Regions:
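Generic secretory/membrane-interface signal
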Residues: 9-11, 174-178, 226, 305
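Detector for methionine-enriched segments
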Residues: 1, 58-59, 108, 197, ...
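Non-catalytic extracellular/periplasmic "stalk"
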Residues: 24-205, 209
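Catalytic cores of peptidoglycan-degrading enzymes
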Residues: 199-336
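Bacterial Sec-dependent N-terminal signal peptides
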Residues: 1-27
């Protein structure tokens, strides 16, 4: 691919307070590519922070002189590579934001999760733009790695919670399979929300954090290790739980390990999860808006006390929830 012009500018600085007072500075960059048959503009967060995500928003402008024998609509994929490897670490497919006002403009968005176990190295993004099955454009975008530390904790379980944690029943297996099928669903039409999300509770009392490396100490003397996929808020039973963003309820039911549980779809492949509830106030199929009351907190399922577990999943992988409290889709930013 021939680049006539390529511009990178630091557009936005976000100071994010991480665990243990660790300050993470996330930068956002823009780029422009001028081609013979189209102009490509994009914006993305260029800081690779373990446990967060990378989102790329892209506008493809096709001139009015576009040849009719070539497809107007383009498809694109996003891949994360480690420079020392030949296979991508993560990948995703761009989907329409529904914001394009001109027929010759096509705006797309894609997000990919970043494992909390990513190690310091040289990484880059590869965007592949296709026009039908013929022409392919490849765009390489640089990334800057920023380390993040995660907490470690040991959680002693009584006999009741030990039984829940070690439950190998077919019922629990079916519940896990059902949830995984939902989280693996990427519905390109599910563009329900592009604005920054909001916390599901007004409380700021965290009892556990996303990415905690856990050891569960069983009542029988045995133990197991686990990774904590969300944030736990230590709030009294019956506290209000609100939708973090606009979306559709795709699960609202009892699960052996997470108690009364709700899952909401916000974007293609992006879901919020709410666990250990005492009461559910929505049902599967309901549409919700940011701040809608959806449940009351509790201590159902595997819980050592009353709390709300809030979790975010992108393409099945857990992502640090606070990432989505920022303008992660770059909504309202003029980048083209």
């Amino acid at each position: 691919m021939k680049n006539i012009k390529k511009i990178f500018v630091v557009l936005l600085l976000l100071q994010i307070e991480a665990l243990f007072g660790q300050a993470i500075t996330q930068t956002t960059s823009t780029a422009k590519y001028q081609e013979e048959d189209c102009n490509i503009y994009l914006i993305y967060n260029d800081s690779l922070v373990p446990g967060d995500a990378i989102f790329v928003r892209m506008m493809i402008q096709t001139p009015k002189t576009h040849k009719k024998d070539k497809p107007l609509e383009k498809q694109a994929t996003l891949q994360l590579y480690r420079k020392s490897k030949t296979k991508p670490i993560e990948s995703g497919v761009f989907y329409s934001t529904g914001k394009s006002k001109k027929a010759t403009n096509q705006e797309m968005l894609c997000g990919i999760p970043l494992s909390s176990f990513l190690e310091k190295d040289d990484y880059y993004l590869l965007i592949t733009v296709k026009e039908g099955n013929d022409s392919v454009k490849e765009i390489n975008l640089p990334l800057t790695f920023q380390a993040r530390k995660f907490n470690s904790e040991t959680i002693p379980l009584d006999s009741t919670n030990t039984a829940i944690k070690t439950d190998n029943s077919s019922a629990r297996a079916a519940q896990i399979e059902k949830l995984n099928e939902i989280l693996a669903t990427v519905n390109a039409d599910a563009v329900n929300a592009l604005k920054p999300m909001a916390s599901p509770t007004t409380s700021t009392r965290y009892t556990s954090w996303f990415g905690d490396r856990r050891v569960y100490a069983y009542s029988n003397g045995k133990s197991s290790t686990s990774l904590h996929y969300g944030n736990d808020y230590g709030i009294p039973e019956g506290s209000e739980v609100k939708a973090c963003s606009d979306g559709k309820v795709v699960l609202a039911e009892w699960r052996n390990s997470t108690g009364w549980s709700i899952v909401i779809e916000h974007l293609p492949g992006l879901y919020s999860l709410y666990y250990h509830l005492s009461e559910m106030l929505v049902k599967e199929g309901d549409t919700v808006k940011t701040g809608d009351l959806i449940a009351k907190s509790g201590k159902t399922g595997l819980a050592t006390g009353p709390h709300l577990h809030w979790e975010m999943r992108l393409n099945m992988s857990a992502v640090r929830p606070e990432f989505f409290l920022t303008n992660f889709t770059f909504e309202g930013i003029n980048y083209y």
